[in-house]
Design a protein with these regions (language model features):
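Helix-to-loop junction immediately C-terminal to a conserved catalytic motif
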Residues: 57, 373
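Conserved ABC transporter NBD signature motif
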Residues: 65-77, 381-389, 398
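Conserved ABC ATPase "signature" region
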Residues: 123-141, 434-452
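Conserved ABC ATPase signature
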Residues: 145-149, 153, 456-460
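Catalytic Walker B motif of ABC-type/P-loop ATPase nucleotide-binding domains
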Residues: 170-173, 481-484
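H-loop/switch region of ABC-family ATPase nucleotide-binding domains
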Residues: 205-206, 516-517
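Conserved ABC ATPase "signature" C-loop
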Residues: 223-224, 534-535
Length: 592
């Protein structure tokens, strides 16, 4: 590497090791990034993605104690030789949790902070503040307290702070991981605009469908090393994508499904529009209809026998006769500031159901959950769980009926070892010592944590801590598990592991309710979907029928999975509820 290179970023890292860790976090990483690129860094958990971001931004070695054997240049300048104040004009860095970067009393002060420290004239500072807030659509929040922002709003303010510095490079570590679909859309729309206007973007992202349409390149990491570094279409053209442990866009999965069955396309489609255009262009049947109902005509598609069920074997068919385990009747609630959170909500759930509660931020989902566990005492008679009126129960008693998993598992982990964390509830209930040992180890084994029994919980990965929180709840044998955003912060495999445990709990007779924005998980695991909007329940139906209500679900602020947009674009029957079914429908249309 030499100063004056045309690359904006050059990195040659032999190793990076945190002083408290026995193993290296990065090894043998070499990469360069040219001006104007949009680069996505992806990979499974603990693959070194965040550590690479720290090195590319100078956080390592300047702010985080780590041993770096290697060099990183940005704009021809060696980061090791610069003070952090000298790094700021070169690049901006967005952390996964935006609240960690906001510390002033108002949005105006937060966005002004960077330009003020560059000692710019007051007029220039004000111009930059207003221009950056206008770009992210946050002008009306100028005097809003930073502690009064939603997650999506806070992330847009952090982006505004970086824009006010006018650095040529932006590095973002999972910038939308904790946002709802609308918040994710806003973040990536803004990043796409910035890239079109000349900024170089480097973003860590696991949900590649969010960025596939405009990213130029993908860097795949595993075990601290870069194992793939390719243009995005070349990467998605690979036949071994399923071995990488990452989420693959449905458009790409469909491409490979058809290719394996003899339907070849010149390019891998990255968007729904490209799928439609590619089929029209590359298939041997020029009259193949792609936007009319003809492609699905005379091609029966019975509901697939997946976890979501269907009309012929409706998993909810016994709801009218089975006694409800949860009965919510005409529940309304307003917060002290007058905000109406719930408005005449009624809902019942039977034993053995797997129910997903979805909706945009502010729809009332979490408020409803808090009433189920007694954190917000409901009016008498409105919430009944297992025959008990929740308004008459203490939180401790309610927790025996409903086990609650927070979105952030660290809020409910407080013991010094993995074993003690799971055993805590049993000991509190005066369970005999031998039984505590037996049941705790069974729970740890089920959660694939038994080999970590003596480890401190905070040495575990986010996915392991999520499974630990579930194990400590499940071991108490509540009839109901209520899980808030089970996939937040998890990679594809970690999310699948956690959802597999929840499905195992349900299969054993338990009832599972999840609050989520991840519609891919909903379609794979949930039997039933409850759609909330503005404090009311707008839809309550089997998962397999959600496609029939495409417009209503979209209007509720829920970002639908890519395969649902494919079904709509190709005018397939609503029961076509996964990529293989879409592929078979397309093949049937081609054969006619």
């Amino acid at each position: 590497m030499v100063e004056g290179s045309p690359e904006l970023v050059q990195a040659q890292i032999k190793s990076a090791r945190y002083y408290a860790a026995p193993d290296v976090a990065l090894k043998d990483v070499e990469l360069s990034i040219r001006p104007g690129e949009f680069v996505v860094i992806t990979g499974p958990a603990a693959s070194g993605k965040s550590t690479l971001c720290y090195c590319l931004t100078g956080v390592i070695p300047h702010s985080i104690s780590a041993e770096l054997d290697g060099e990183v240049f940005v704009a021809g300048r060696r980061l090791r030789d610069l003070r952090l104040a000298e790094v700021a004009p070169l690049l901006g860095f967005v952390l996964q949790a935006p609240e960690n970067q906001l510390f002033s009393l108002s949005v105006r002060e937060d966005v002004s902070f960077g330009p003020e420290n560059l000692c710019l004239p007051i007029d220039d500072i004000q111009r930059r503040v207003m221009a950056s807030l206008a770009f992210t659509g946050m002008t009306e929040y100028l005097e809003r307290g930073s502690d009064q922002l939603s997650g999506g709003e806070a992330q847009r303010v952090v982006l505004s702070c970086l824009l006010a510095l006018d650095a040529p490079l932006l590095v973002l570590d999972q910038p939308a991981a904790e946002l709802d679909p609308e918040g994710r859309r806003h973040v990536y729309q803004n990043l796409h605009r910035l890239n079109r206007e000349g900024k170089t973007i480097v973003v860590v992202e696991d949900r590649l469908g969010d960025v596939a349409g405009f990213a130029s390149r993908i860097i795949l990491m595993q075990s601290g090393s870069v194992v793939r570094d390719e243009p995005i279409r070349a990467f998605f053209a690979r036949s071994d994508l399923d071995t990488f442990g990452i989420r693959i866009p449905d458009t790409v999965l469909l491409h490979h499904y058809l290719q394996e069955r003899g339907v070849n396309s010149r390019v891998v489609p990255l968007t729904v529009e490209e799928v439609v255009e590619g089929l029209a262009r590359d298939t041997p049947t020029p009259t193949l209809p792609l936007r009319g109902s003809e492609i699905g005509a005379e091609t029966p598609h019975p509901p697939l026998p997946g976890k979501g069920g269907g009309e012929s074997d409706d998993p909810l068919s016994g709801r009218e006769t089975a006694a409800p385990l949860i009965e919510i009747s005409h529940l309304s609630f307003s917060y002290p500031n007058g905000a109406r959170a719930l408005d005449d909500v009624s809902l019942s759930c039977r034993a053995g159901e797997f129910v997903a509660i979805i909706g945009e931020n502010g729809a009332g989902k979490t408020t409803l959950a808090k009433h189920l566990i007694g954190l917000l005492p409901p009016p008498p008679g409105t919430v009944v769980v297992a025959g008990k009126d929740v308004s008459q129960l203490s939180v401790a008693r309610a927790s025996r009926l409903v086990g609650y998993l927070f979105q952030d598992p660290d809020y409910q982990i407080f013991n010094g070892s993995v074993f003690d964390e799971v055993a805590f509830g049993l000991r509190a209930r005066k369970v005999p010592k031998d039984q505590v040992e037996e049941e705790t180890m069974a729970a740890l084994g089920r959660s694939k944590l038994d080999h970590l029994r003596n480890e401190h919980p905070y040495t575990l990965s986010r996915g392991q801590r999520q499974r630990l929180a579930l194990a400590s709840t499940w071991v108490l044998r509540p009839p109901i598990l209520l899980v808030d955003e089970p996939s937040t912060g998890l990679d594809h495999r970690e999310a699948a592991d956690l959802m597999g445990l929840l499905e195992e709990f349900r299969a054993g007779g338990g009832t599972v309710l999840i609050i989520t924005h991840d519609l891919e998980l909903v379609f794979e695991y949930a039997q039933r979907v409850v759609v909330m909007r503005r404090g009311t329940i707008r839809l309550d139906l089997p998962t397999a029928r959600v496609q029939e209500h495409f417009d209503e679900v979209s209007a509720a602020g829920v970002h639908l999975p890519q395969f649902m947009h494919l079904v709509a674009a190709l005018a397939l029957p609503p029961a076509t509820n996964d990529v293989p079914a879409i592929g078979e429908a397309v093949l049937a249309g081609l054969r006619r």
